[in-house]
Amino acid sequence: MAKYTKEIPAVKEKTFTAVTTEVKEGYEVLQFKDQGTPMPYIFRDNDEMVITFVGSSFEGEYPIIEEGLFTGLEINNRSGNMELRIPVDINDTWGYLVDLSDNTIKIRIKNSVKEVESFYQPLSGLTVVLDAGHGGKDPGSLNPKGGTTEAQLNLEFSSFVEDRLVALGAKVVNTRTDDTFVSLWDRVSIFNDNNGDYFVSVHHNASVNTGVNGVEMYYAQDADKKLAESLSKDMSDVTNRKNRGPYQWRQYVLRSSLGPSVLIEAGFVSEDKEFIDLQDETKQILSAGTVADNIAKDLVRRVQVAK
């Protein structure tokens, strides 16, 4: 088992004296109720999560946790830092979130999502957050000759993705449904606040080289590479656009560790022929189908790995 050995600098100490646990539907929460939001350093391997809060200590009554994801929790004070060791099997969880809002520490760990035994609605019980990029004061990428903006295309494409996801049984939460500006912070917050299972950000690309074309997918977490890879190939196949492959990129909206995230670049608005093709409703519907279908395939793959 890997060990957490990174040297962490100590800062002015915050002392915590109370800790509670709470079981919610689909996840559990560990909360330190005293004032303070110290910087967390997180390390995780297959059977343990280690969270170190810089410049903090725990001086309260040691919690007795007899069941749930936090069973076996260890709290240690080391070199001016508070260290939590949570012996949780990665296969028993879907994702996690360390929330430092409201001057408290809340650690949320999601239970592993279960595969649904339904041929027609394999995504029943799943929450997918759809993020139509840009909007409002931010039109996104533009074709040099004008016309439909990327923000408009993102919204149109997202609506088709939503239709297909709902047909497969998923609950869909949109970061925007009209031409309004939504900050990157708020987009991620919508995912976290709704305890999302998947996050899909929809975009269309552009380049100063107007001859560049094709589909691209972006992911941040290593575990999401297969989803991005498969989706890039399938969208390329149904649209006959070049498959430019998946790229790893720690873009802000992809950084949440609560669940799988992928950012779609469906094509290049800067290339004239592809710009026209991106506005074709049939191609939009076909592309949307690959998004929903790949989420369904990815869910099955992750559940099988966890067994």
Which residues fall in each region the model found?
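Active-site histidine-acidic residue metal-binding/catalytic motifs
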Residues: 108-190, 194, 273-275
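Active-site-adjacent substrate-binding region
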Residues: 224-247
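A short, glycine/acidic-enriched catalytic loop
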Residues: 138-148, 207-230
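Active-site-adjacent mobile loop/cap segments within catalytic or ligand-binding domains
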Residues: 201-208, 218-219, 247-307
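Conserved hydrophobic/aromatic pocket- or pore-lining residues that grip, position, or stack substrates
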Residues: 130, 154, 200, 231, ...
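Conserved acidic residues
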Residues: 197
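Stable alpha-helical elements in mature extracytoplasmic
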Residues: 150-153, 157, 161, 184-187, ...
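Short linear recognition/processing motifs and adjacent strand/loop elements at protein termini
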Residues: 1-128, 149, 167, 204, ...
